[in-house]
């Protein structure tokens, strides 16, 4: 593919590399951009997306490239263009142009990388991070003698790291947790495009149409404004399936449509969820539950302030949701006791959100090392154990806030989860049955932590019940 200079000026990437070095010390670093992923044979590839750590420090999507350096001295190693690349792929910027735009001293052929590694003290002295793409991971294994297999990631922990790679991971996390002005500008731009997409999806929704028509309307806005989906869009009347990959069903009057769709602009992600009635009007039970989830969203957002532990933000959403379920007669008991026991997780089984940045779940390739602060580990309790983030919030961190209510058969029919609450009368199934038309509701915003009140970056995307209904029925 053709390689183009970054949107930002070189000073952005020079400053980021300096911050990384200040956090790391004078260790040499090598980061891989990664290779395209084939769909079904080598020449037919998915759209290329560079590894986020490389993208953060260079702003450039360059297949197969490697960034190598320390201090203020950095080089990129890449495969020279083939003679016929311009014919098939179009002309790329010259290497001199790219070097100046990225702020590196030189761009050299990839064949010279091995000698450059020796010049930096050898593979053992270099710090690197595991590549995501299999070909790049194989290169790392050969060049750096790292014991990283292709399938050794755990659900939460990613690849185990030793020094000096562990030090690089901690340094990278420290500089990427809070966003600079350039990053925030791109996130805002992505959210503006997401706003257009959600409005287009709402406007197209009506009984008889298919979910995929709404998805197409949303993603058309992404494409029309120079963005791509940041992840696989979820557009489904089966809102109880948390990460539903299918959008083939016809929508019917009485359905709720859950839409979790965000644009990615210049590599930076947005992540927004709205839920709306297909007919343009909530039923009484749908409206009651929608307002409970909305209040949980609002209350949790208000907690996004410097120094607040994100786990406490999650628990605030849980308390608000539980209070609403008690008010509706679905649960019985003391609010705090119910939350401590995890009764709310029967209906809200995931965490309230995650970091947002270049990755929609930012830095999740580094596992809980990124998401959890020092000394913090995941809970073993159902629901709370799925919390992706447990750090103290700081200025210019961007997080999602996404409480929900779901009627998941696999949970509600599981005696190991529901049994204790059934036996002591906490769970009132007869009352719950009245809410059968509420399969799933999620309301998700992207929120910046500031020195004062939280900034809801996605505030323009309608979420009040009447505003949502007005957009669907317009």
Predicted region positions:
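Active-site neighborhoods and metal-handling regions in enzymes and metal-associated proteins
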Residues: 1-474
């Amino acid at each position: 593919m053709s390689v183009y200079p970054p949107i930002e000026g070189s000073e952005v990437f020079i400053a980021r590399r300096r911050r990384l070095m200040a956090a790391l010390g004078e260790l040499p670093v090598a980061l891989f951009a990664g290779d395209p992923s084939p769909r079904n044979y080598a020449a037919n590839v998915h759209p290329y997306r560079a590894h986020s750590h490389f993208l953060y420090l260079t702003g450039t999507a360059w297949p197969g490239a490697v960034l190598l350096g320390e201090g203020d001295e950095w080089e990129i190693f890449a495969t020279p263009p083939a003679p016929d690349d311009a014919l098939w792929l179009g002309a790329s910027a010259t290497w001199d142009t790219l070097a100046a735009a990225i702020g590196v001293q030189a761009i050299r052929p990839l064949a010279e990388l091995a000698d450059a590694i020796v010049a930096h003290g050898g593979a053992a002295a270099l710090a690197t991070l595991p590549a995501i793409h299999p070909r790049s991971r194989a290169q790392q294994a050969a060049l750096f003698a790292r014991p990283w297999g292709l399938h050794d990631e755990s659900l939460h922990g990613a690849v185990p790291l030793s020094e000096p790679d562990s030090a690089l991971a901690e340094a990278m996390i420290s500089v990427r947790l809070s966003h600079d002005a350039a990053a925030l500008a791109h996130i805002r731009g992505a959210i503006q495009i997401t706003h257009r997409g959600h409005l287009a999806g709402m406007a197209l929704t009506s009984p008889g149409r298919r979910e995929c028509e709404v998805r197409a309307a949303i993603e058309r806005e992404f494409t029309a404004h120079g963005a791509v989906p940041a992840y696989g869009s979820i557009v489904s009347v089966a809102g109880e399936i948390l990460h539903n990959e299918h959008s083939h069903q016809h929508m019917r009057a009485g359905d709720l449509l859950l839409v979790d769709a965000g644009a990615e602009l210049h590599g930076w992600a947005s992540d927004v969820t709205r839920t709306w009635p297909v007919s343009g009007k909530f039923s009484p039970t749908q409206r009651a539950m929608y307002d409970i989830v909305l209040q949980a969203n609002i209350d949790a957002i208000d907690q996004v302030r410097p120094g607040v532990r994100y786990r406490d933000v999650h628990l605030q959403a849980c308390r608000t949701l539980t209070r609403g379920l008690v008010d509706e007669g679905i649960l019985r008991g003391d609010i705090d006791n119910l939350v401590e026991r995890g009764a709310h997780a029967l209906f809200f089984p995931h965490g309230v959100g995650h970091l947002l940045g270049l990755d929609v779940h930012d830095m999740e390739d580094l596992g809980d090392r990124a998401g959890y602060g020092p000394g913090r580990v995941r809970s073993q309790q159902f629901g709370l154990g799925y919390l992706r983030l447990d750090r103290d919030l700081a200025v210019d961190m961007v997080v999602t806030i996404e409480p929900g209510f779901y009627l998941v058969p696999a949970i509600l029919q599981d005696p190991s989860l529901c049994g204790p609450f059934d036996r002591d009368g906490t769970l009132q199934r007869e009352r719950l049955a009245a809410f059968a038309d509420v399969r799933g509701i999620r309301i998700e915003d992207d929120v910046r932590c500031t020195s004062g009140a939280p900034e809801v970056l996605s505030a323009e995307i309608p979420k009040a019940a009447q505003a949502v209904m007005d957009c669907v029925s317009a």
